[in-house]
């Protein structure tokens, strides 16, 4: 698990890049600034989400200490139900699936719509989808967000582990740039370790290449 730490310089860059969406009223980072090349710079300024391992307990403590209230009791299920409904509404026909697992919501982002082959930079055409995700994450901020990258079995295990980590980091960097608290996030790459389909077919390999985002309630 890794955190991003935003420096004063990074914060200035992000503030200068922020615009207000006229349709939603939400602030987001300018698409122009997040275009080819400059998108990577803003992502780096927002924090690389690299290497700092921390416990779930520590993440929760950081958020509660910053004034974010924890969910409790019967309100948890309703809160996550409402978040699920918003995610399904905003992500309809996007290619991203929404699955409810207990009190958590899981997003599956297939790599073919998120990244070019063997690349870890988010496709510009996927920015709008991530903006929609960020808007829901802003509204339902009493949640923790785990971003995990996965690959198929082609190539070496070391390469796949690194690629999956870089892809997960790219998605998390983009989302934290949309004024989301980095303390909510963890990032991990699991390479080819957790396939959801056979790697014996092209179709199965395509399903295995993905980034999954698990959103769990802050309790």
Give a label for each model feature:
Residues 81-112:
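Amphipathic, membrane-active segments
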Residues 2-8:
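Sec-dependent signal peptide recognition
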Residues 14-17:
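C-terminal motif of bacterial Sec signal peptides marking the signal peptidase cleavage site
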Residues 21-86:
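Short, low-complexity, glycine-enriched hydrophobic/amphipathic alpha-helices that associate
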Residues 148-218:
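Periplasmic OmpA-like peptidoglycan-binding domain that tethers envelope proteins to the cell wall
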Residues 90, 114-149, 176, 206-208, ...:
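Periplasmic peptidoglycan-binding/anchoring modules of Gram-negative envelope and division proteins
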Residues 41, 45, 83, 87, ...:
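Stable alpha-helical elements in mature extracytoplasmic
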Residues 73-77, 114-122, 157-160:
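Second-shell loop/turn segments in exported
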């Amino acid at each position: 698990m890794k955190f991003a730490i935003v420096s004063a310089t990074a914060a200035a860059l992000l503030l200068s890049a922020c615009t207000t969406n006229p349709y939603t009223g939400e602030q987001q980072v300018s698409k122009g600034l997040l275009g080819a090349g400059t998108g990577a710079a803003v992502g780096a300024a927002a924090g690389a989400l690299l290497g700092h391992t921390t416990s779930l307990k520590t993440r929760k403590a950081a958020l509660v200490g910053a004034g974010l209230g924890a969910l409790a009791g019967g309100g948890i299920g309703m809160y996550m139900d409402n978040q699920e409904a918003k995610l399904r509404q905003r992500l309809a026909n996007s290619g991203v699936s929404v699955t409810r697992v207990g009190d958590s919501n899981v997003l599956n982002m297939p790599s073919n719509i998120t990244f070019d082959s063997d690349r870890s930079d988010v496709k510009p055409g996927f920015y709008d989808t991530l903006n929609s995700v960020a808007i829901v994450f802003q509204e339902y901020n009493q949640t923790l967000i785990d971003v995990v990258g996965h690959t198929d079995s082609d190539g070496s295990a070391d390469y796949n582990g690194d690629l999956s980590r870089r892809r997960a980091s790219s998605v998390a960097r983009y989302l934290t740039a949309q004024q989301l608290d980095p303390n909510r996030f963890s990032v991990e790459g699991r390479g080819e370790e957790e396939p959801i389909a056979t790697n014996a077919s092209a179709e199965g390999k395509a399903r295995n290449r993905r980034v999954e985002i698990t959103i769990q309630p802050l309790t």
